[in-house]
Amino acid sequence: MTIAEYTALKECINYHMNRYYNEDAPEISDYEYDMLMQELKAAEKEHPEWVTPDSPSQKIGGIAKREAGVKVKHTVPMPSIEDVFTKEDVKTWVEKVQQMHPDAKFSVETKIDGLSLKMGYTKREGVENQMDLTAAVTRGDGFLFGESVFENALVIPDIKKTLSLPYDYLELRGEVYMSHEDFERFNEEQEKAGKKTAANPRNLAAGTLRQLDASITKERGLRMFVFNVQQGPAELMSSQTAGYT
């Protein structure tokens, strides 16, 4: 690959990254996007001197443009999950982990295609073993800032509004998504009304979570799956399994 081809590849990926993260209107499939990223990373591995701050490999995602959104600083980064595409990739990763931790055990879970959300829970003043949901923030750029969607999180049934736990603060990360059934129902209703349909459940979930009117968020039936403890007491942070229990 020449440096001109590399520059063109960067521009192409940045374009599709903006379409995916900021405009919720992707033009290529996730697989095609991942293949472009793999090609970019391979070129940068071979030519590290080409890497510049505007490279997609140096970013995590897009920053929401909605002016009404309130930016919240990340105390813990929210990086994207690294992809692997072959059994050999998985085997190589497992071997690296086992070299560092010979007795390592693994937790395996299904990848849900939605958008990341972190939820902050704070101890209720004067009440034992009671924590309240006090923040709900999207991934945003993944490093510095996300967007507050607290009011909308309050109307998603899967998101617990209180926890019966004895901690001062707890931060959880999960995936907000829409079921295929709800997605199909939405598109059917849009077609009947002569309105634009959504491209896929992930895009519709992202747009729904960012609605300014929480009643719209509520009626579309978003769901949530929690998969990580971002911040909390040591006993919950010791392993993935400890966080689940």
Specify the residue positions occupied by each region the protein language model found.
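RNA/tRNA-interacting regions in translation and RNA-turnover enzymes
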Residues: 1-245
